[in-house]
């Protein structure tokens, strides 16, 4: 059920999606190497900087090791769903007349946020440029003039592929509600999610959409979504958002998508156990995914970032679950549990999730060791970015308390 009410506030400050260009790929710097020599014809796709919004790409810049190459390079855009890559569009082949090439993509290429840019070497002349070492950047390389392929560790290259494209943005994921539910829990619990959206008084009506990322299923264009519109100065409330979206039965997370340049509304959520005689639960706020800083204190973990999450002080009275929500570049990380005295418990559990994937499981499954009194877990991200959350639940009342982890250290 959705309700609407007018609220009165003395002052409200809302965020705004900054008016910047749609971008994808690595900006140019002086390359010191080339891509791998997999074959005369090969395709490279940059993984770490997916399209930052939905829109159209009209210009691409890339480095080529030799000039004077005829019909040697194609610019390609791929869409990744899970570990499957499918060609969206390609332009070229382009004649190479300089090492640093800027080409017009005509007609412009429509892209979705998260799409990836790549280059195909289609003539035996010159090579795409790269920077070694790649630090936090990497790309995949496959043989041939590819139109589809599957991710595997064997195709990953550790260097920074030098290709970049720009264009016009139309909409963007403004933020993520980390965990939502409308499903049966343990011990007779039934968890639902109340979501509220407040539009600033000074703004025009705010319209957008919710996109549901279901547990264990890599996100993609076919994910369930629902539009919303909130008049200036009012609140719209959905007492069971996933039921309103027709997606009950599985937990997950929610993307809040807005038109490019729109003011970001205030978004709050409450995940609650609907017991029929009152509720228990926890509040969540929208975690912004635009204009955020890769820095200590953020809720978004990035390559080189570390942080910690508490388990319960009493492992008999409470249970603990750990949730991970990867963003557009996916994530590779290690969760390592520690005893209360600071000594390591086990060797750590490695995890890898493709883009826009939400998963939650028990402490034991996620860390590889049993839950115990006073335990805590260290998060270390090696590639990509993600949001991490721990849920501590009372075994008698099923009352959950969730905390979103923050970055406490980083190696950049």
Predicted regions mapped to residue ranges:
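Context-gated lysine
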Residues: 2, 74-76, 91, 209, ...
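Positively charged, low-complexity intrinsically disordered regions
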Residues: 5-6, 21, 43, 80-81, ...
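Beta-sheet-rich sandwich/jelly-roll-like modules and their strand-loop junctions
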Residues: 19-96, 100, 104-116, 120-184, ...
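Intrinsically disordered, low-complexity segments enriched in polar/charged small residues
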Residues: 7-10, 47, 84-85, 165, ...
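Gly/Pro-rich, tryptophan- and cysteine-flecked surface segments typical
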Residues: 168-412
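Sec-dependent, cleavable N-terminal signal peptides
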Residues: 1-21
């Amino acid at each position: 059920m959705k309700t609407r009410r007018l609220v009165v506030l003395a002052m409200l400050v809302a965020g705004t999606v900054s008016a910047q260009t749609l971008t994808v790929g690595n900006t140019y710097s002086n390359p010191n190497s080339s891509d791998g020599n997999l074959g005369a014809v090969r395709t490279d796709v940059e993984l770490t900087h997916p399209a930052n919004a939905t829109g159209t790409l009209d210009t691409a810049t890339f480095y080529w090791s030799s000039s004077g190459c005829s019909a040697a390079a194609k610019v390609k855009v791929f869409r990744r769903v899970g570990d499957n890559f499918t060609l969206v569009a390609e332009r070229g082949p382009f004649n190479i007349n300089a090492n640093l090439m800027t080409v017009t993509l005509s007609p412009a290429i429509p892209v979705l946020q998260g799409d990836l840019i790549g280059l195909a070497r289609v003539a035996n002349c010159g090579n795409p440029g790269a920077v070694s070492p790649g630090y936090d950047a990497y790309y995949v390389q496959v043989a041939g003039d590819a139109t589809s392929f599957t991710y595997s560790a064997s195709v990953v290259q550790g260097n920074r592929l030098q290709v970049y494209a720009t264009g016009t943005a139309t909409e963007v994921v403004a933020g993520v509600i980390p965990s939502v539910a409308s499903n049966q829990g343990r011990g007779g619990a039934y968890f639902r999610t109340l979501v509220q959206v407040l539009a600033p008084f000074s703004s025009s009506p705010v319209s957008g959409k919710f996109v549901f990322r279901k547990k264990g299923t890599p996100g993609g264009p076919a994910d369930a979504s629902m539009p919303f519109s909130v008049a200036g100065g009012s609140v719209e409330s959905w007492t069971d958002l996933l039921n309103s979206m027709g997606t009950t039965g599985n937990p997950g997370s929610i993307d809040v998508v807005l038109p490019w340049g729109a003011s970001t509304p205030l978004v709050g959520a409450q995940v609650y156990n609907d017991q029929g005689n009152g509720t228990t639960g926890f509040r969540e706020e929208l975690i912004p995914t635009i204009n955020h800083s890769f820095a200590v204190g953020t809720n978004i973990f990035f390559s080189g970032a570390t942080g910690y999450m508490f388990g319960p002080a009493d492992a008999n009275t409470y249970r603990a679950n750990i949730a991970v929500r990867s963003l557009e570049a996916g994530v590779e990380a290690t969760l390592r549990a520690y005893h209360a005295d600071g000594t390591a418990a086990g060797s750590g559990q490695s995890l890898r999730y493709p883009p826009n994937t939400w998963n939650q499981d028990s402490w034991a499954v996620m860390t590889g060791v049993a839950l115990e009194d006073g335990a805590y877990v260290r998060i270390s991200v090696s590639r990509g970015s993600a949001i991490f959350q721990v849920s501590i639940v009372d075994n008698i009342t099923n009352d959950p308390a969730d905390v979103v982890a923050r970055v406490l250290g980083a190696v950049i």
